[in-house]
Amino acid sequence: VDAACELIDFWRFNAWYARQFHDQLQPLVSPDGVENSTEIRPLEGFVLAISPFNFTSIAGNLPSAPALVGCTVVWKPSRNCYYSSYVIMQLMIEAGLPPGVINFLPGSGAEISDLALTNPDFAGLHFTGSTATFQGLWQRIAEALPKLRSYPRIVGETGGKDFVVAHPKCDEQGLVVALLRGSFEYQGQKCSAASRAYLPKSVWSHMGQSLCDEIAKIEMGDARDFSNFMTAVIDQRAFDKITGYIERAKASDTCDVVVGGGSDDSEGWFIEPTIIVTSDPKAESMVEEIFGPVLTVF
């Protein structure tokens, strides 16, 4: 339900904004006998849209936004959400999207990007995903510039390391709720997840145990059972990466895993909601994006 509503919002806003953008660019005054106007042209070539697994509405927005303003798009969806992306594509076709405007192309990211980024008609990149992947794409675009007809437009939204800073006189119960929901909804697999917190010792001494107690109550299981607050992370690669951070924290002299830390990949890729307390503001889990159910408190 949320994904459908958000995608509808994207499409409605984009249509409104495209009209506003066009109107605002028109000259305010034309001398008598002269007609001045500004025409906004689509890119000369195609846009490569690469969408993520964790945000269905963004997956629909990345290819449709450039198409709305006249561009041809090659849409490479995440390998972990082919079906939902396909459903969105079918909806656009049913709504009247002409053939060839958005070209749905599931497959290997490396193979598709290698072909697309070196094609002389490559004109733009619309991307949401990891910082490292975006940097790699940008570098390959730069290397391919001599082969391209124009300078590609590059638009990307990448990861982050969002934080919570608490005041010594904060609402401690409100802080517990904010950290729990901000860190562990969707297993922390979103760029807006609260993955680190800077808390006064006085605050942590009061509410730390309460936070751990609430986390211990979190229900985990099948995503089709809506009584579960958490489910599995997206795939084995994510499972291995996240558990690696947890295991290295357990072995560190400056970190303590105070709740969670367990995992099970016997059926699905389940990782317990985990809190790491550290005395080192530069600890690995304090500075690197984990993209999983791990909160580090300093």
Model-predicted regions and their roles:
Residues 1, 71-75, 193-195:
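Glycine- and acidic
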Residues 1-3, 21-29, 191-192, 223-227:
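Short coil/turn segments at secondary-structure boundaries
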Residues 1-24, 34-35:
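Long amphipathic alpha-helix in the N-terminal Rossmann-like dinucleotide-binding domain
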Residues 20-174:
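Rossmann-like NAD(P) dinucleotide-binding subdomain of oxidoreductase/dehydrogenase enzymes
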Residues 91, 96, 118-119, 124, ...:
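ALDH superfamily catalytic-core signature
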Residues 286:
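Short, solvent-exposed loop/beta-turn-alpha elements that line the ligand-binding surface or hinge
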Residues 293:
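Glycine-rich nucleotide-phosphate-binding loops and adjacent flexible coil segments
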Residues 297-298:
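Conserved beta-strand/loop elements of the cytosolic catalytic core of P-type E1-E2 ATPases, chiefly
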